[in-house]
């Protein structure tokens, strides 16, 4: 290639050399931009689908506990005003829990995540059904009915709540696992991309240096020959 370059006139030689160098660094710049865009896009995906939902899952778990606590208060208190207050808390906790579920649902983009959400929906529906029966029986100052409702909470509601909590815990574990896997994959790709960039820079530097040496020699040689002729004629 350098031999072909040496046969060109100096102007054409320099233009071709500069075009080659500009092309190389243009490709390198494009590669860097593509990597940056890929990183930004995938980092955003990790945040939206794994990091942020972990906080929402934790809040959903907290709200489910609030639902159970409010139910216990409803069947445990012997004051009408306190029972009504706990009913309001119960309704708010149910609403908040379901809002968090709907917030989490769109971020479950994997088959495993969808399966976990289906399990949570099933467990929540079953728990709500038993919970409603408990409140229907125990939302009273009647001691006998309150005791009956408390037994229902232990015998019927507790296993349903445990199933709901297990499903939420499984979703959290899955989300953390998938998020870690995505981060590891992104890290691997970034290391590979940086390695490629370093190699391209090194090759470009070596090529540019070789090109400059070849051009300088091709210019220097005829000048030296011309100088020798002048010395001979002198």
Question: Where are each of the predicted segments found?
Answer:
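Internal alpha-helical transmembrane segments of multi-pass membrane proteins, especially GPCRs
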Residues: 12-19, 48, 52, 56, ...
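Membrane-proximal N-terminal soluble sensing/regulatory segments of transmembrane proteins
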Residues: 42-129, 133-160, 180-181
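N-terminal membrane-insertion alpha helix
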Residues: 25-50, 76, 176, 185-192, ...
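Extreme N-terminal signal-anchor transmembrane helix of membrane signaling/transducer proteins, especially
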Residues: 11-39, 199-207, 211
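Selective recognition of signaling/oligomerization transmembrane alpha-helices
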Residues: 20, 177-229, 234
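Positive-inside N-terminal membrane-insertion signal
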Residues: 1-23, 149, 192, 220
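Juxtamembrane amphipathic/hinge helix adjacent to a transmembrane helix
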Residues: 166-182
